[in-house]
Structure formats: structure tokens, C-alpha cells
Amino acid sequence: MDPVRNPYAPGAGQRPPELAGRGRELDVFDVVLERIARGRPERSLMLTGLRGVGKTVLLNTLRSQAINHLWGTGKIEARPDQSLRRPVAAALHMAVRELAPRHRAPDRIDAFLGVLKAFAQRAATAGRGGAAPKLRDRWQPGIDVPASSGRADSGDIEIDLVELLTDAAAVATDVGTGIAIFIDEMQDLGAEDVSALCAACHELSQLGAPLIVVGAGLPHLPAVLSAAKSYSERLFRYQRIDRLDRIAADQALCAPAEREQVEYEQKALDLLYEKSGGYPYFVQAYGKATWDHAPRSPITAADVRVAAPEAEAELAVGFFGSRFERATPAEREYMRAMATLALVDGEEGGRDDMDAAVPTAEIARALGRKPASLSPARDALIKKGLIYSGERGTVAFTVPHFGRYLRTQPA
């Protein structure tokens, strides 16, 4: 098989050649866009799921849908060490610039940009806790109009964000369209920023304003939002993004191959689904390796067996190993105990991926430690995005098959 023609694309946020199994999510978002365009009330959208299920790819695809509906859009990636103020200002600047050529009153655009500049510069005047800002935070937006005063510049992120997004929505109303802000890795926002974002979305929904937030994050994102505002459970539409079913996984492999006049034998598809578990990133990784090793079409199960070790070696280094290396020895000990217990619980529950959620009390018992003494390791792993707590008193891996990987590594 010609490696130059290999259609598969395992990569972080890289769109696969065939976006299989996400038709429902795309259809739902089309309805959201149309309803808002007609003045109907709609909720902002939150996508949740493990790493490797294609949340970022789907987020980018939804943004393309919004652009096709002539919406203004902006996208940011949340980081645990960065305030929301600066990136959201940049995202809104981009969104309004997309709408500006269709606005009949340039003065209205300039007025909003003045508010936006004041909002952005407020972040540059003082760091968190009133300390002087770091050099990297002394950012000036590329806005030519002077900063306004008395709007979105109080220094209270919740007050300022409500005012800023309300003004941005008014600009979209003037144009007869909407604005969508896309936020990836949303679970990494600070508590104050999450609270401010919830408050802003609440205000926008009450006004029926044409501005929505589309967030993507790990499975515990709903809990993060709920901890910030009790009404967040009713404020957002939540969509769990999971692994592909068998039909969708076969489509993700076969459709790109057919465009290159290549076919798969059924037993090859059976084995590929067994190896990948239906997780989109793994489907692409195994598909790419199999293509490169297959001598001819149709691709056989023997080709998959030959290629699988290469795919697994690449995943072990780039997908699993890079995350494992970020953990301290104490954190690795914690995860190894998790992996062992997850296997037992997964077998008892009939789980074929064998990475079930594990009670923290059982981890402490397995390590012969008091639960309180393990809290620093658990909290650090959650902060690093390696595990999450979906329910009180339990933890699970954020990466599919991570427990399986750990169980193959020497202690």
C-alpha cells in the first residue's frame, strides 16, 4: 500500500477523513443555530468525554457550522494558569470583526470595540490578588479605537463578562445573526471564571440574546459548572461524546479507504474494532499503521496483527507515555493501584475496556495508607488532567485504555 495515499489522521484535534458517528450532534447544533436566528430561546452547549473521543474535532466542526450560518465566532483553549479575561477578549474581537462588514452603523462597532478594549486592558492593570501583572499578561488588543469607561471595566470578572457579552450580543442582533464562543478544555478554567461564565450565560438566556457558549471538557465538567452555580444543571445542554459504535467505526475506516479504491475484509474490521475499542483516536492510529503494513487490497486480519504492535508502540510513547511521564513517583503509585482495581471492577461489571471508576477508599486500602494521606496525589492528578472524579468518592482515568497501558509497565 502506498503510504503517501494513507488517508488516516491520528492527531490532537486533527479532523479525520471521515467524521463518523457524530451526525446527531451536528443536527442538534443546526437546530440551535436556526432557533436562535428566529428569536427562539436556546441554551449554550457543553460537550463532555474522555480524551481521544474527538471533542476538539467536533468543537471545530460546530464552529464551521456557525460560520456557514454567517455567525461571528471565536475559539479559545482554557489553561489552568490563565485568566479567562484575555483569551475571551481576543475571541470576541475575532467574532465581531467577522460581523463588522455587514453592520450598517460603524459607530456601533467602534462603541463595542471601546468596551472590549477596556475589558481587555483591565486585565493588564493588575494581576490576581492585586499584584503586578506578569510580562506575558501585559497584552494590548489590536484595537484602534480608544477604550471606553464605565462598562465591563470594574475589575470584577463576573460583572464585566456579563456586560461585555450582552453588548456583543446586541451587535449580533443589529446584523440579524448570532455570536458563538467555543471553549476547549473548559474544565481548566478557574473557579471565578467558571462562575462568571455561568452568570453571563444565565443573563443572555433570560434576555434571549443571540450569543451562545459551546464548551468542551472532560467528563467532570458538569460537576465543575454545578459547583460554580447551582442553576448550571438547567443552564446548559450537555452532550456526552463517547466512543464510536461498530457501524460508525467501520465507516471511519472504510469510507476513506474506498475513496482510494481499497477494501477491508470483515475479519480485519472485527480485529480493528477489538484493538481500538471504538475510540476515534485509536481507530485512526490502528488504521494508519495497518494501511502502511498491508501489501495490497483487501486488507486482512493478518495485516492488522502485523501492524498492531507498531500502533501500540506509537500510542505507548505519544499518547500514554507522555502523560505518564508528567506524574511524580507518588502519583504513579496511585495510578498503578487504580489500574489494578479498575481491572477487577471492570471484569465484574462486564466492561470490555476494563477501566472502571474506582472508590478512593479502595485505593487507600490497596496501598495500605490513610485516604487523607493520598489526597495530595489524587488532587495533583486531577489538576494534571490524568484522572477525574465523576462521583464523590470515586476516580477514573481521563484517557481510555490508560489502565491497560499501566498494567503492562514494570513497577
Where are the predicted features?
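Walker A/P-loop nucleotide-binding motif
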Residues: 41-61, 367
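A short, basic N-terminal segment
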Residues: 1-43, 94
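Winged-helix-like regulatory helical subdomains adjacent to P-loop NTPase cores
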Residues: 278, 284-371
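Conserved small helical "lid"/interfacial subdomain of P-loop NTPases
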Residues: 241-268, 275, 286
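Conserved Walker B catalytic segment
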Residues: 146-219
